[in-house]
Amino acid sequence: MRILVANDDGYLAPGLAALVAVCKEFGDVEVVAPEQNASGTSNALTLTRPLSVHTAANGFRYVNGTPSDCVHVALTGLLAQRPDLVVSGINNGANMGDDTIYSGTVAAAMEGYLFGVPAIAFSLVDKGWSHLDAATRAARGVLAHVLASGWHREHWLLNVNIPSRPDAAELPLQITRLGKRHASEPVICQTSPRGEPIYWIGAAGDAREAGEGTDFHAVANGHVSITPLQVDLTDHGRLGTWSQRWQDHGSRA
C-alpha cells in the first residue's frame, strides 16, 4: 500500500505529522506538503512561476505552492510509483458545508481524485489542535475500515470532519451530506502604516442548513462525519429547464 499525504496548513503542522504517523501503520508513505500555510486556496494551481521542492530533516518534502500543486507535482513527476491512496490533513479547523469549495485540504484530496486515485480529506473541527490525539485515533479508524474493506480499489473522494472532543473516536461514524453556511461576515477594514485602506476577509458564516443528516449535525452531536464528494458541477436538475428555455427563445446567441 502506497499512500501520499498532503495538507494545506504547511509541512510543519501538527496535524500533518499526526496523520503521517497513522498512515505509516498501513503502508509506505510519501509526504508532499506546502512550504507555508495555504488555507483557503481551493484548487488553485501555480501557473505563473516554477515550483521548488525541498526535503525537510524529517523526510517530508515541501513545495512553495498550493496544496493542489503539491499533489499535482507528486503524481505527475515527483513520485516513482503511483500511490494507492491520497490523504490530506489533519486540518486545523472544520471543512463542512460551503467550506469545501474554498478548502485547500479538500482540494489536495480532490487533486488525487482527479487523477483517478481514491482520496480522503481529514479535518479537526475546532482550531487550535485541541484533542488532536483523539482525532488521530478517529482517522486511524476510518483508514482501517476503508482498507480492510477493500474500498481503496474503487474511485471515490471522502470528506471527513472530526469533532474536537476526547471521545471523537468512540461514537459511531455518520455518513452525511454537506450542510450550508450563512454568508461570510463583512470584510474587516483597517489602515496600513502608509495610510492606505486594507481589508481582511471576514469570518465564515454560521451554519444555515444543519439539520439531521448534515455534516454540521453529525459533529455537533459528537460523531465523525464522512461526506462522499463529487466534482461534477453540472446542475443536472435544471438541464431540461434551460434546454427548453433556449429552444423556446431560439438556440442562437
Curated annotation (Swiss-Prot):
Record family assignment: Belongs to the SurE nucleotidase family.
What HAMAP family does the record point to?
A: SurE (MF_00060)
Cite the EC number: 3.1.3.5
Residues recorded as binding a divalent metal cation, renumbered to this chain, are 8-9, 39, 91
Localisation: Cytoplasm
NCBIfam families attached to this UniProt entry: PRK00346.1-3 (NF001489), PRK00346.1-4 (NF001490), surE (TIGR00087)
Please share the entry's free-text remark on the cofactor: Binds 1 divalent metal cation per subunit.
**Cofactor(s) demanded:** a divalent metal cation
Name of the protein in question: 5'-nucleotidase SurE
Question: Which keywords does UniProt give here?
Answer: Cytoplasm, Hydrolase, Metal-binding, Nucleotide-binding
| Entries under PANTHER family matching the protein | 5'-NUCLEOTIDASE SURE (PTHR30457), 5'_3'-NUCLEOTIDASE SURE (PTHR30457:SF12)
Its UniProt entry gives the catalysed reaction(s) as: a ribonucleoside 5'-phosphate + H2O = a ribonucleoside + phosphate
Q: Which GO terms describe its molecular function?
A: 3'-nucleotidase activity; 5'-nucleotidase activity; exopolyphosphatase activity; metal ion binding; nucleotide binding
Q: Could you tell me the superkingdom of the organism this chain comes from?
A: Bacteria
